[in-house]
A protein has these predicted regions:
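PLP-dependent enzyme catalytic core of the Aspartate aminotransferase-like
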Residues: 386-458
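Short glycine-rich or small-residue beta-strand-to-loop segments that form or flank ligand, phosphate
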Residues: 68, 253, 406-410
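Conserved small-domain helix->loop->beta segment predominantly found in fold-type I
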Residues: 291-369, 373-401, 436-447
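Conserved PLP-enzyme active-site core in the AAT-like
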Residues: 2-34, 38-41, 46-56, 61, ...
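Short, conserved charged micro-motifs
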Residues: 276-277, 355-363, 412-421
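Short amphipathic alpha-helical segments
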Residues: 264, 344, 403-407
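C-terminal, active-site-flanking charged/polar segments
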Residues: 21, 58, 366-371, 427
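A common structural junction motif
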Residues: 286-288, 375-377, 426-434
Length: 458
């Protein structure tokens, strides 16, 4: 029987939510072109679209907001943030950005030229799009076990080091401006990356003179998994684990909207002095002066405080346990999910949930729509809509190995009753899964199409 962790906090403020009737939801879904991104938040009952920017901030963060210094240059909150980032990551330089994709944009603008390739365990959507927008090629080299939804391994987010070495030899280091690891691996089920894999990836890339960056959105959750699953780190403080992870890299991008527990914010941190000068100039053009980076001083303060809160062991035990509870309850109902559960979300395996729908008819998106229709739950497809693409040489559609529906859990927001409701809805839907049909595009933008695409039932 799944056990629910006791929350290490008290609730001081609440926000009302309201369930729409099934007839209303049918109309809402049709008007939105069967894209849950186009649905108003007030029409959603349980919102599991993303854990990005949807956290409940603490009283300490809210108190910090009242201390916002809105000076254009040199606000005190910048230096509080600098102290937090330097202490945790050890990188010499950083710039704040309004969110993670802005940090990616600046990094790739300064490093990637047309024809370059950027390897990773698995790029997430905005990372992939930012590489492509610069004329580069994002390449996923996840270990094979990470593509098997039912295989249980402690670190399924690891990059395949043999694939990485072969890729470098085949492509040439001169055509690889940097390599990356996404920790935890969002596209692959929120799975953690082991310390050994981070270290060995660093050695492989540096052995060829290639810089190494981390996509560190969920670095704290990754550090906690290392503490849980690697006996060599069982007694290590989480801060020291995080510091070691960052020590192997030359820099990182981060959306602070995840493990820094804020509603807006991000940063790009790095060691290279010359690259930092380019980054800072690009930041001024795109985001603003280097001591605010497109953010108000109050947001910088909330981010500084949230970075420390996100490393709290009691909080992370609750956070990971919260997600594990939802996963175990779903497994008790024999609902197919990606195993073992990751840190920030539970991923339904749409190909096993809806085996009668081929990838060309978008089973993940069909399941997303069915979840909303059945229970007012908003989730997101991470499969063919997000990642399928046309082979430029053959014109054939290349589909991803994984066809997932991510139910991302906002931090410190939902209770056990909310998660039980999600389980009950999924169980009802699974019983009548044969009634769910596929979808087809009526509008599909070239980049990041999942945000604005429109669909119709097949």
């Amino acid at each position: 029987m799944a056990e629910f962790p006791v929350e290490p906090f008290k609730i001081k403020a609440v926000e009302p939510i309201r369930q729409r009737g099934r007839g209303e939801r049918e109309s809402i879904l049709k008007d939105a072109g069967y894209n849950l991104f186009a649905i108003r938040a007030c029409d959603v009952y349980i919102d599991l679209l993303t854990d990005s920017g949807t956290s409940a901030m603490s009283d300490r963060q809210w108190a910090g907001i009242m201390m916002g210094d809105e000076s254009y240059a040199g606000c005190r909150n910048f230096f509080h943030l600098e102290e937090a980032i330097t202490s945790i990551t050890g990188f010499r330089h950083f710039v704040p950005t309004h969110q993670g994709r802005a940090a990616e944009n600046i990094l790739f603008t300064c490093t990637v030229k047309p024809g370059d390739s950027v390897p990773s365990n698995m790029h997430f959507d905005t990372t992939q799009a930012n590489v492509v927008a610069r004329g580069g090629r994002p390449v996923d080299l996840i270990a094979d076990e990470g593509l098997d939804p039912t295989f249980r391994a402690p670190f399924k987010g690891d990059i395949d080091l043999e694939k990485l070495e072969a890729f470098i030899e085949r492509t040439g280091p001169e055509n690889i401006p940097l390599g990356m690891l996404t920790i935890t691996n969002n596209s692959g089920g929120g799975q953690p990356v082991s310390m050994a894999n981070i270290r060995n990836t660093s050695e492989t890339l540096h052995g060829h003179g290639i810089p190494f960056f981390l996509d560190a959105c969920r670095y704290a959750e990754n550090a906690y998994f290392i503490k849980l699953r690697d006996r060599g780190y069982a007694n290590a403080p989480l801060l020291e684990i995080a510091q070691e992870m960052f020590s192997y890299a030359d820099g990182c991008t981060m959306s602070a909207k995840k493990d820094a527990l804020v509603n807006i914010g991000g940063f790009l941190a790095l060691n290279d002095d010359s690259l930092f000068q380019q980054v800072r100039q690009e930041l001024i053009i795109r985001e603003g002066f280097p001591t605010y980076g497109g953010l108000a001083g109050r947001d910088l303060e909330a981010m500084a405080r949230g970075l420390w809160e996100g490393l709290n062991e009691d909080y992370l035990a609750y956070r990971i346990g919260h997600t594990r509870y939802l996963a175990e309850r779903l497994l008790e109902e024999n609902i197919p999910i990606l195993e073992p559960p990751g840190g920030h979300a539970v991923y339904l395996d749409a190909r096993r949930f809806l085996p009668h729908i081929g990838q060309g008819e978008l089973p993940g998106q069909a399941l997303v729509c069915a979840l909303y229709l059945e229970g007012g739950i908003r989730s997101v497809e991470i499969g063919s809509v997000m990642f399928a693409h046309e082979d430029p040489e053959t014109g054939q559609m290349i589909y991803p190995e994984l066809e997932l529906v991510r139910m991302a859990i906002p931090r410190r927001v939902y209770t056990q009753a909310h998660l039980d409701y999600v389980v009950e809805t999924c169980a009802r839907l699974y019983e009548k899964r044969d009634e769910i049909g596929g979808l087809a595009y009526t509008h599909a933008p070239e980049l990041l199409r999942h945000f604005t695409a429109r669909f119709e039932p097949v």
